[in-house]
């Protein structure tokens, strides 16, 4: 059931930015209130990212009101905060479909709207992309403006600073809006800051400043005195020295919920020359008290009743793989004081909350810095510590060079606990863990394990921890099978699989949790079902023995078929001249769309029914 737009009379008049810009300025505060309430009612019915969007309502309205989007280009970082942007750009009536199969994409997406100029999902890309657009805008000479909106978390990543450094060097006209909702840069927000921002972004101030530079250019002592006076004035209330050193003109911080101040400041800044940075202070979850008090809990929400002011409690069902990892980490830390846990800004998602509380001195959240996380782990390993890097599959992609150069090349004992491997579901193609087996399998000295259930996951984590070189355990998002998890930890035989069901004719080699979906197919086809456990080193002896007693193979994995575990089986069989027909089942050669995990596995033929159907059709062909 969709939200009744008749309850939002001002928002009903602003289905697009063109309509928004036709509204009188005086109506914007009421429009913002309606937009915030509409967002709350919509997301609570669909599930999705809530707290970030509640905090960017006024900023979104102001940007589209001042800038001529889509001609002027507005680039959002990550995209969690872009729900108000979607509502104001012709997608309001489809918001209930967000993150659902065939629905709106969870993040800004180029194929969805002309207002989404950059497809996003991973952090810290906005400034670099916006700079490229700014260079192109200068070349085309049409007066196009470019704005990047980035959060205080995303701006900490190395590539954001690389882009800031480059932008300050080439000095193109662009605006970076720093959406600061964590008070991590400055707490100075209020009337004085808003007033100063208006002054410093205004024409009179900038004219005097630039003119003064020219007049005083021949008088170094006087020029230096004037510069210091300006810095002293700004330094009393402005934490912008860092950005000024990058070559940006820094304005702010200003109240990101004061629509009047935002519009006036953006109007003043719109035609300023060179790189500009506007520091905006916002409150995550603004306008909905439960989200203001618990912005982490309300970052991503299931369907809920906002009038009850509480989220539904998770059912006490099967533990998630993340929880299994978190418990193993605590148990292992109790046994080995050298263990160090590392995560790039994914404490809650990776199951590290308990560990961070029990072992705060051995827990490191390095922020959105995947490359640093891996090299930091390498340094710890060199110093005889035992680092465990908890990281999402899709985010490990950013640290590939560090994994090769700083860890694997030096055969350092770093354990990678790779969460969200396989299909994650509603977050869509930017977050599907589709490639980790493929890119890890090519790395020498790497051990890669694929647990079929949560008990195997625990034992594999222990196995990887005992390795003398780099090891990876990949496991999916969501709950396990409900199997009894053994408290005792035992190292598995390295590179050895196990036969789950003995059959004949066809041997199904399963890598990971899809083993559970293959059981019914194996029964129906009287096929042998194997839990391979290790992608690398692979159980070659087991594969060879199966090749001698079976007519064909089926490989099964929740990774891209190209370069994946099935490809490793193909290579092994061809190299040994024991060529057998092989059907590789896994993720296709495309970016996999959003939907529930169950929907997408069924769509790709990787649920129980689909696996059996694919094998039967292949055997009959």
UniProtKB/Swiss-Prot annotation:
One of its GO terms (cellular component) is cytosol. Gene3D superfamilies: 3.40.50.920, 3.40.50.970. Thiamine diphosphate binds at residues 80, 121-123, 153-154, 181, 288, 370. Mg(2+) binds at residues 152, 181. It catalyses: D-glyceraldehyde 3-phosphate + pyruvate + H(+) = 1-deoxy-D-xylulose 5-phosphate + CO2. Binds 1 Mg(2+) ion per subunit. Binds 1 thiamine pyrophosphate per subunit. It comes from the Bacteria. Keywords: Isoprene biosynthesis, Magnesium, Metal-binding, Thiamine biosynthesis, Thiamine pyrophosphate, Transferase. Pathway: Metabolic intermediate biosynthesis; 1-deoxy-D-xylulose 5-phosphate biosynthesis; 1-deoxy-D-xylulose 5-phosphate from D-glyceraldehyde 3-phosphate and pyruvate: step 1/1. Its cofactor is Mg(2+); thiamine diphosphate. GO terms for molecular function: 1-deoxy-D-xylulose-5-phosphate synthase activity; magnesium ion binding; thiamine pyrophosphate binding. It holds the Pfam family DXP_synthase_N. GO terms for biological process: 1-deoxy-D-xylulose 5-phosphate biosynthetic process; isopentenyl diphosphate biosynthetic process, methylerythritol 4-phosphate pathway; terpenoid biosynthetic process; thiamine biosynthetic process. PANTHER family: 1-D-DEOXYXYLULOSE 5-PHOSPHATE SYNTHASE-RELATED, 1-DEOXY-D-XYLULOSE-5-PHOSPHATE SYNTHASE, CHLOROPLASTIC. Catalyzes the acyloin condensation reaction between C atoms 2 and 3 of pyruvate and glyceraldehyde 3-phosphate to yield 1-deoxy-D-xylulose-5-phosphate (DXP). NCBIfam families: dxs, PRK05444.2-2. Belongs to the transketolase family. DXPS subfamily. Homodimer. This is 1-deoxy-D-xylulose-5-phosphate synthase. The gene is dxs.
């Amino acid at each position: 059931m969709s939200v009744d737009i008749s309850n939002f009379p001002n928002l009903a008049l602003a289905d697009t930015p063109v309509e928004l810009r036709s509204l009188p300025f005086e109506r914007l505060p009421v429009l913002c209130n309606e937009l915030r309430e509409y967002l709350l009612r919509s997301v609570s019915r669909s599930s999705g990212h809530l707290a970030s969007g509640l905090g960017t309502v006024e900023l979104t309205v102001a940007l589209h009101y001042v800038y001529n989007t889509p001609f002027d280009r507005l680039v959002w970082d990550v995209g969690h905060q872009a729900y108000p942007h979607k509502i104001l750009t012709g997608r309001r009536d489809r918001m209930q479909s967000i993150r659902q199969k065939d629905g709106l994409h969870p993040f800004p997406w180029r194929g969805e709207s002309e207002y989404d100029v950059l497809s996003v999902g991973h952090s810290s890309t906005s400034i670099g992309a916006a700079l490229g657009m700014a260079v192109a805008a200068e070349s085309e000479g049409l007066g196009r403006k470019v704005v990047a909106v980035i959060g205080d978390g995303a701006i900490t990543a190395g590539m954001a600073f690389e882009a800031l450094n480059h932008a300050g060097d080439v000095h193109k006209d662009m605006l970076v809006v720093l959406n600061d909702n964590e008070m991590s840069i400055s707490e100075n927000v209020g009337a004085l800051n808003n007033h100063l921002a208006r002054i410093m972004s205004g024409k009179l101030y900038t004219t005097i400043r630039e003119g003064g530079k020219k007049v005083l250019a021949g008088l170094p002592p006087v020029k230096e005195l004037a510069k210091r006076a300006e810095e002293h004035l700004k330094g009393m209330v402005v934490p912008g020295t860092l950005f000024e050193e990058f070559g940006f003109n820094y304005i702010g911080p200003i109240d990101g919920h004061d629509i009047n101040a935002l519009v006036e400041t953006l109007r003043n800044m719109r035609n300023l020359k060179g790189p500009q940075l506007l520091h905006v202070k916002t409150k995550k979850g603004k306008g909905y008290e439960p989200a203001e008090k618990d912005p982490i809990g309300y970052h991503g929400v299931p369907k809920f009743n906002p009038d009850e002011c509480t989220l539904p409690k998770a059912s006490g069902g099967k533990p998630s793989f993340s929880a299994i990892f978190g418990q193993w980490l605590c148990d292992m830390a109790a046994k080995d004081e050298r263990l160090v846990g590392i995560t790039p800004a994914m404490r809650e998602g990776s199951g590290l909350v308990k560990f961070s509380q029990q072992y705060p001195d051995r827990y490191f959240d390095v922020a959105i810095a995947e490359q640093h996380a891996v090299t930091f782990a390498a340094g710890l390993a060199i110093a005889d510590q035992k680092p465990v890097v908890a990281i999402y599959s899709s985010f490990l992609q950013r640290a590939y060079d560090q994994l090769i150069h700083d860890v694997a090349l030096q055969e350092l004992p770093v354990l990678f606990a790779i969460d969200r491997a396989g299909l994650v579901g509603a977050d869509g193609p930017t977050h599907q863990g589709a490639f980790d087996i493929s890119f890890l399998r090519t790395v020498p000295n790497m051990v890669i394990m694929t647990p079929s259930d949560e008990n195997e996951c625990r034992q594999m984590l222990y196995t990887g921890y005992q390795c003398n070189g780099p090891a990876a355990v990949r496991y999916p998002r969501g709950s396990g099978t409900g199997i009894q998890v053994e408290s005792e930890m035992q190292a598995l035989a390295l590179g050895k699989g196990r036969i789950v069901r003995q059959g004949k004719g066809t041997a199904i080699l399963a890598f990971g949790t899809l083993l559970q979906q293959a059981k019914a197919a194996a029964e129906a086809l009287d096929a042998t079902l194997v839990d391979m456990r290790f992608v690398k080193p692979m159980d070659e002896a087991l594969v060879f023995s199966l090749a001698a007693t079976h007519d064909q193979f089926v490989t099964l994995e929740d990774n891209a078929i190209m370069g994946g575990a099935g490809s490793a089986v193909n290579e092994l069989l061809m190299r040994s001249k024991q060529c057998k027909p092989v059907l590789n089942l896994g993720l296709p050669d495309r970016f996999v769309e959003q939907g529930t995990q169950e929907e997408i596995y069924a769509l790709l033929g990787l649920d129980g029914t689909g696996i059996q159907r694919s094998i039967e059709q292949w055997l009959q062909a």
